[in-house]
Design a protein with these regions (language model features):
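C-terminal subdomain of alpha/beta-hydrolase-fold enzymes, centered on the catalytic histidine
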Residues: 250-408
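Short beta-strand element of the alpha/beta-hydrolase
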Residues: 96-104
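Conserved hydrolase catalytic core segment
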Residues: 118-129, 167-230
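Non-catalytic accessory segments flanking enzyme active sites
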Residues: 14-90, 95, 298, 302-324
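Active-site loop/oxyanion-hole signature of alpha/beta-hydrolase fold enzymes
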Residues: 93, 133, 137-179, 205
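Alpha/beta-hydrolase
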Residues: 1-2, 6-15, 20-21, 25, ...
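The serine-hydrolase catalytic nucleophile loop
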Residues: 105-117
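Glycine-rich "HGGG/HGxG" loop immediately N-terminal to the catalytic nucleophile
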Residues: 59, 110, 125-128, 137-151, ...
Length: 408
């Protein structure tokens, strides 16, 4: 059974962090260095000073505890029982649709916060309502870490699927971006009898291929890309060239990186803050927000660096032993209805014809603003997409058996 969970970081852990911050040694910086070289020294100094003078983790902790937090045990094949933390916000609408929200890196369950009232309460005004479940993935946040090798996409998907079943949701929808995209896509691949529809952002996909999608390939070759699509491809190429170094390191040598991220809070802060700043579309991050995101990683039950292993494990999956290859979720997944949100400043923005290689796309929105963190930057856009998909007349209406999103 699921039990209520209260986030309570020990006083000694907070004190230890303060002591580490107090003796931090900062690097120098070239004259006129900017964001193109990484997190600027001035930003790190400002955040350190704000931590010392103003930031109150207990206030952030109270904000997190205001959500409906729970924990439960999930048995994962070949990995034993894992203690999983999750937020579970039920709607008062009896026919609400069960929805799993899956975060990525450097995100957490906190990303769902702004979505909760938009998704659980709109039924009062005649809109579609959802019961929302947002876990801390294993190795992230307040869920248990994994000590064995080989915990990849199959196991993350299994964990999330079994969590939904344990909560009584035999059929459900999902929403995810970044690793949440990969994990929810894997859920659709492995559990099509349960995962009936999915909304995705921060997507990754390939152009249509002549052998697999000849008509789509021809359409892609003959159709001129829109201005939005051309800008998206340019953004994607720029990220591959100048912004993907973190990914290669975490995909190949996460253990080497872990010493810096575990020993130095400044290293973790700079490593994460660069992504928050670069991947968002001029989102006005407050210092309190940034430090709260950082602290969820620093105080993570599995340690600050455990989350980076998802990159290595997912890209080194052994298909001969049942592992899901990293690129498999970027290809066609059958039996699931998909909605896609494209944000112009995300680091992977693809043409519509490419997105159609992912599966049965029943809704695709091109947002005028926004970056990688869709649920944080523009929760209204994510909620509007879900409404459009599942409302009466929407192309995903009624696909979750017995739960159409309306009062019964």
């Amino acid at each position: 059974m699921a039990q209520p969970y209260h986030i309570a970081v020990p006083d000694h852990a907070i004190q230890e962090l303060k002591e580490k911050l107090a003796v931090s040694t900062l690097p120098d910086e070239l004259q006129d260095a900017g964001w193109d070289m990484g997190t600027p020294l001035s930003d790190v100094k400002r955040l350190l000073q704000y931590w010392k003078d103003h930031f109150d983790w207990r206030k952030s902790e109270a904000m997190l505890n205001a959500m409906s937090n729970y924990q439960t045990d999930i048995d994962v094949e070949d990995f034993g029982t894992l203690d999983i933390h999750f937020v579970h916000q039920r709607s008062p609408i009896t026919g609400a649709i069960p929805l799993l929200f899956c975060h990525g890196w450097p995100g957490s369950f906190l990303e769902v916060q702004k979505l909760l009232p938009l998704l659980t309460e709109p039924g009062k005004n005649g809109g579609v309502a959802f019961h929302v479940v947002a876990p801390s993935l294993p190795n992230f946040g307040f869920s248990q870490g994994v000590q064995q090798r080989g915990f990849g996409l199959r196991q993350y998907a299994e964990t999330c699927h079994k969590l939904m079943l344990k909560l009584g949701y035999t059929q459900y929808a999902t929403q995810g971006g970044d690793w949440g995209f990969h994990i929810t896509r894997t859920m659709g691949l492995l559990y099509p009898e349960s995962c009936k529809a999915s909304h995705i952002n921060a997507t990754e996909c390939f152009p249509p291929s002549l052998p697999k999608q000849p008509l789509l390939w021809l359409q892609d070759k003959l159709t001129c890309y829109t201005e939005h699509e051309r800008a998206g491809l340019k953004m994607t190429e720029e990220h591959e060239r100048e912004g993907s170094g973190y990914s290669m390191l975490q995909m190949t040598k996460p253990q080497t990186l872990s010493y810096a991220l575990t020993d130095s809070p400044v290293a973790l802060l700079a490593w994460m803050y660069e992504k928050l700043k670069d991947w968002a579309d001029d989102y006005p991050w407050t210092d309190d927000e940034i430090l709260t995101w950082f602290c969820i990683y620093w105080f993570s039950r599995a340690g600050p660096a455990a989350s980076s292993r998802i990159y290595y494990e997912s890209t080194h999956a052994d298909a001969s032993r049942g592992g899901i290859p990293y690129q498999r979720p970027m290809q066609w997944v059958d039996h699931v209805k998909y909605g896609v949100a494209s944000f112009p400043k995300d680091h992977n923005v693809h043409p519509n014809t490419w997105a159609k290689t992912l599966g049965d796309i029943v809704h695709h929105s091109r947002q005028p603003h926004g970056g990688h963190f869709g649920a944080v930057e523009h929760p209204d856009a994510i909620a509007a997409d879900l409404q459009a998909m599942f409302e009466r007349g929407g192309n995903a209406y009624g696909c979750v058996e017995g739960c159409d999103g309306y009062e019964k």
